[in-house]
Amino acid sequence: MEELSADEIRRRRLARLAGGQTSQPTTPLTSPQRENPPGPPIAASAPGPSQSLGLNVHNMTPATSPIGAAGVAHRSQSSEGVSSLSSSPSNSLETQSQSLSRSQSMDIDGVSCEKSMSQVDVDSGIENMEVDENDRREKRSLSDKEPSSGPEVSEEQALQLVCKIFRVSWKDRDRDVIFLSSLSAQFKQNPKEVFSDFKDLIGQILMEVLMMSTQTRDENPFASLTATSQPIATAARSPDRNLMLNTGSSSGTSPMFCNMGSFSTSSLSSLGASGGASNWDSYSDHFTIETCKETDMLNYLIECFDRVGIEEKKAPKMCSQPAVSQLLSNIRSQCISHTALVLQGSLTQPRSLQQPSFLVPYMLCRNLPYGFIQELVRTTHQDEEVFKQIFIPILQGLALAAKECSLESDYFKYPLMALGELCETKFGKTHPMCNLVASLPLWLPKSLSPGSGRELQRLSYLGAFFSFSVFAEDDAKVVEKYFSGPAITLENTRVVSQSLQHYLELGRQELFKILHSILLNGETREAALSYMAALVNANMKKAQMQADDRLVSTDGFMLNLLWVLQQLSTKIKLETVDPTYIFHPRCRITLPNDETRINATMEDVNERLTELYGDQPPFSEPKFPTECFFLTLHAHHLSILPSCRRYIRRLRAIRELNRTVEDLKNNESQWKDSPLATRHREMLKRCKTQLKKLVRCKACADAGLLDESFLRRCLNFYGLLIQLMLRILDPAYPDVTLPLNSEVPKVFAALPEFYVEDVAEFLFFIVQYSPQVLYEPCTQDIVMFLVVMLCNQNYIRNPYLVAKLVEVMFMTNPSVQPRTQKFFEMIENHPLSTKLLVPSLMKFYTDVEHTGATSEFYDKFTIRYHISTIFKSLWQNIAHHGTFMEEFNSGKQFVRYINMLINDTTFLLDESLESLKRIHEVQEEMKNKEQWDQLPRDQQQARQSQLAQDERVSRSYLALATETVDMFHLLTKQVQKPFLRPELGPRLAAMLNFNLQQLCGPKCRDLKVENPEKYGFEPKKLLDQLTDIYLQLDCARFAKAIADDQRSYSKELFEEVISKMRKAGIKSTIAIEKFKLLAEKVEEIVAKNARAEIDYSDAPDEFRDPLMDTLMTDPVRLPSGTVMDRSIILRHLLNSPTDPFNRQMLTESMLEPVPELKEQIQAWMREKQSSDH
């Protein structure tokens, strides 16, 4: 084969360029790294047809080349863009631009930026990537949009365009261009041999410029360039780029790069109470561009890349021509390729993965040209080593920046946005950055200590990004910045809270982008799920009531995770969720072995596992919707609920501190002259300081927790959970029928108890603190769930869980929370509630007598108070009124309920009135100042402490007692018969008599206290209600029960009651007369009993009740063989359904009458009566 001459080689190379190549070699080549510019090319090109585009270098001479100073001069005002070029080499670029513009449409084509995603130049030293066919089609279609209407671009114009973009010249020196001396010498020597094609020329230009920059500072090639259109200089002026860069100041710094600046003041900063300046020092290391040779090179390459886009916008039709488009694409590729070389240290000194990347400040300051970072990813991701060497330092730099940023300013979002953009970069179906992030050693580090939750937050790669928080305990800077002013007004706090919630939303949206991209990427989906599951499992202790905060992730971190999971779960359809996932052998969530189940023991759970999976290997893999749903469910358990509990604890602490401060202030006159005055003043000062701190922390928590949109997302997710559980309870959902099947579904019984408890706790929280959130589409399902659970209490083993559901209903009662009246009406008017809700609540009222807890005796009063309040509201509803009446007349259940009412009223009134007596006693002592001052100091303090304790007890018990008496008053007005049963009537009469004696007896003055309304004590109202109950039950049987009470009843007591009612005007004259008639009737029975009194104390032992040691009148035999009096054992069974001697289960139906013994007793009594007379 005949050897080609140098001229023939040149012609064929130019012809190939003119043909508009669409593909590039895939063999990686390395840019020559040398001080001198590249010489003439050596390798020959394959022969190809010569096409005329006017790009023939044979016609080029130094005299006609467009490389003079004027040829690349920019106007100083040209920062908005660079004009197109004309074909005249003799005029300045300004004149040429005007000439060419007349023949080109100057419409801005927004899609021209898409051409920026080009292939990598062969001189970069980085392996080229095949362009996706879709990309090719897209580029062709974009080119077809605006067919060229002007003349084809000549080679001279193309050279002018290259020089303008790179701001270089190889003819004349000027302050606005970089003079390329080596290239100039080659053009003078032999212009035909300088470059083989434009890619070669671009490579030589860039290499010479960059190698020049590696020289000493005195020879900085960028020093003569003035700032024009580069993004770095304009970033600070852009409305959405409010960060200026700090490049330092030195004589060698090019004026084209921005000098020391400061962040603009955030709009949020002006709202802070302190009004302090931004903490620039905290972020300057990460947001400042270091002044060095590498950043000089990067600035130059970034600006060149940006000028390509400017040219495309200024002259879209010209740039759409294949040759120009390919040229601009090559320029972009070469800029990116040389950027990669700079970042690797190939042009200066090699860099390790531990060194921070020079590119991080540019990314944080949001001033890289559109498509720059994506093109860098595209160019490098096929070479794994190069890709890691460039992007691992970038990822580390972003994580460090995220770790040091805070919500005290809006800087926190920039690391998130930068990582989000990286992760969203996609080529085909692959997200290269997601692959790299998930392959990092710290993606999911192994736990090294018991505090695995806090470890994951601190050590895992994404931990730093998820850690931003508004809570004071997570980030003290937030409270200091926004809530530490001398006077924090309510309006100011509201505005700041809204702004903080907005910033939280922005940050969480970026977190969602990051995690969503990693999940979308098939290669990293498993890693993402494993990471989320690890966070959930590592923070299981966060659900504990007294969790050690040092061992678990912060509240802010967990709420951020929850927000992201909520977004991932938004479109999940329940039909795709497997309700048995929590039992699946491949379930990612690890529940503690002692996790309480709704209605099952661990043995039951293990049986269920065997039934589900014991004989069916291999198991079907859980689907993503199922895994995502349950991860979100458990994230709620570990984030929003612990945060709510902390919020409530803080409010309680604020109330207690307020009370302490008020007490100290109110009693200052007593201690200001005492030896303890200094101590009290110090305590007052400490309490005020602590109170101020807690109020500020609450303001932060308000912003983080009382976010309506976030709470609505939580409520809607719990609505999904409720739907899932209702489907398990009744597959016919939404057409649920009550009562449910007596056998509890095994899947439901084995579910963790907190699935139900969390719903109750969350509802309780929003009803109290954000009731407007309650009305969502899911509300109907929530109402149905409450009704179903309250009417089927046997489905829940833990009575305290049922009590929480009752408390939710109580809290929505209009008398408690007026803003939830609509919700309460939805419950009471629900079709499933009208027949079963009242009897179910009445049954629970009695069942709660025994809960199994050590505090059951005191707990029952609060629970019954809630039920009584609910009953009073339901009584007003016509639909429930009939159910009440049916229950009143049905017998056994209502009788037990009345028995508990009697028990509670007896205890609560007794305790309340006794505490009032003690309060009266101490108050009387303190009134006698002389006597009080004589008491020793420690005795005074003990008495004051007892007074405070009695005041708390009195307030609490009187509130409960008042509600119980109200219920008694209501019931006795409607129905009387059950109250007169033998096992109830005497006890009720004795209770009423005793309390009348307390209110009107000889010692009633002991109940007189200062400010009785402070304790909720209304003696007139109480007396009125008690005497009303007497009148409502007025009959011969009740009068006999009153007369039989020998402990409290007396004629004088009733006379005193009548006198007080008349004197205080408590009742009408008619009512008083009725009460007087009842008193006379009772007195007649007392006199009759006295005349017929017979002493039965010598009755034989077999006639005596073994429990009460009284004469039996209706003996019955228990299953154990013991014989008791029927009235006594029935009274016992009302309190406890057990045999009093062996604690075995016992019901009334198990009692066996003993007629023979009864006859013997009656015969003995007749004999006794006849002998006495």
UniProtKB/Swiss-Prot annotation:
GO cellular component: cytoplasm; nucleus; ubiquitin ligase complex
EC supergroup of this enzyme: transferase
Protein's gene: Ube4b
Quaternary structure annotation from Swiss-Prot or TrEMBL: Interacts with VCP. Interacts with STUB1/CHIP and UNC45B.
Modified residues (N-acetylmethionine): M1
Protein name (record): Ubiquitin conjugation factor E4 B
Domain U-box: 1098-1171
Record flagged with keyword Transferase: yes
Species annotation: Mus musculus (Mouse)
PANTHER family linked: UBIQUITIN CONJUGATION FACTOR E4 B, UBIQUITINATION FACTOR E4
Domain notes: The U-box domain is required for the ubiquitin protein ligase activity.
Biased composition (Basic and acidic residues): 134-147
